[in-house]
Amino acid sequence: MKHSVSVTCCALLVSSISLSYAAEVPSGTVLAEKQELVRHIKDEPASLDPAKAVGLPEIQVIRDLFEGLVNQNEKGEIVPGVATQWKSNDNRIWTFTLRDNAKWADGTPVTAQDFVYSWQRLVDPKTLSPFAWFAALAGINNAQAIIDGKATPDQLGVTAVDAHTLKIQLDKPLPWFVNLTANFAFFPVQKANVESGKEWTKPGNLIGNGAYVLKDRVVNEKLVVVPNTHYWDNAKTVLQKVTFLPINQESAATKRYLAGDIDITESFPKNMYQKLLKDIPGQVYTPPQLGTYYYAFNTQKGPTADQRVRLALSMTIDRRLMTEKVLGTGEKPAWHFTPDVTAGFTPEPSPFEQMSQEELNAQAKTLLSAAGYGPQKPLKLTLLYNTSENHQKIAIAVASMWKKNLGVDVKLRNQEWKTYIDSRNTGNFDVIRASWVGDYNEPSTFLTLLTSTHSGNISRFNNPAYDKVLAQASTENTVKARNADYNAAEKILMEQAPIAPIYQYTNGRLIKPWLKGYPINNPEDVAYSRTMYIVKH
């Protein structure tokens, strides 16, 4: 990738002068006189404090109000933010050089100490940050100990060498560390602002360092942001007003879009997909997302403890039929756990992908028979999913495939979210619906989920060879070497079948033809209003 940190982890990146990620208006473009955008978000933001954010609604707004060390471009590649360059000789100690013209919205400079304060605050148990774990995931020295109350925040492995130099020490080498710093949890906050009182995130009070400032907020109605004149790249900001409308019903948001009240939606009802394609061609988008929908098998007890049973069940899921007919809204069949769009991942073709469904079904029957199941002794199991029309539709289709091709008696069981989570955490299931959307754009965010010690390992999969190859990947210095390890891990998953990947997520949204600069192909759907503009229409 052109500016991938993963590729150049041991080198110094070039200055940000040539890498500014802002609105790029082609020569000759006639801009609309009124540069005002209305964006749909799925709910009222729970908090505009980066350390308290957890859901996409607040994150979308926070990305406009604050800026971290690095940003993502339209392809999801890392580009400079507050930092102009970074280096590491061992992937363990990282040094970031901050731009000297980065300022807070009140005109004061953004310094390395601001990041030290913000990251210490993130892991401080008193902050109660729902994303404190991300600092531990990144491997910052003492992060987990501080979260657990066994060390103090000032012992975090982050120091300000001087006003514009930030040094971070990790507990082990991590080649893709810089990728993680694009996460909103690592955005800086101004200490004086935070300590000014509980209402520091309200309009008129909030002092961020992003391209926009919060001008107005009416709870459950709207949030309005306008350009931050002190932002280092403000000269390239085109949109002069962005209004976020929180609407939690897809149908209601779509209705307002069609009425001309909204320029871009976060989603649309899947059952309207074909109609929308027909009614508003060129405005319906379903780009790939960094996420996989899958079924997890209980590898520790019950019939699915047998690898042959798991593999037979996985092979019999007709992924092509599922995406084309059952879903039919642009999803792709998942032949790997790691989505195809993941940075640093070039998947080797799965043998399953190269076989017809008839061939897969025949092999699955042989496997199930070898495991002792057949017409005289049919396999019986329970398929658990959390309550949702979409999950139910998929479960019915899969159960039908298993019954028709393998004679499996499947009992479908749906549970409300809290009960479902309890069942998942206690291993009270045979097969359970699950999904994973990457926390960062690198294969490890998916594959480490199935390592033996990971809390998200729903299947309780325990495979030393799998753990070993992923541990090895974390020490590799090149994308090519890591990709080989990741494909080796995917091969183990295919053969052992602790999970059955079903489809890769897409991110459905509606976009008016006059809105340009939206990074529609960013796998994590990371978007900044400063890259967008409206053409004359």
What are these regions (language model features)?
Residues 332-370, 388-393:
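Structural transition elements
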Residues 77, 144, 149-155, 159, ...:
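Gly/Pro-rich hinge or "lid" segments in bacterial periplasmic/extracellular proteins
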Residues 219, 361, 365-438, 479, ...:
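Ligand/substrate-recognition segments at binding pockets and active sites
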Residues 215-226, 243-301, 324, 333:
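Extracellular/periplasmic solute-recognition and catalytic clefts
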Residues 40-90, 120, 205-208:
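N-terminal lobe/hinge region of extracytoplasmic solute-binding protein
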Residues 509-537:
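Long beta-strand-rich cores associated with HINT superfamily self-processing modules
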Residues 111-118, 163-169, 173, 210-211, ...:
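Alpha-helical secondary-structure segments
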Residues 25, 30, 95, 159, ...:
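Extracytoplasmic/peripheral linker and loop segments enriched in polar/acidic and small residues
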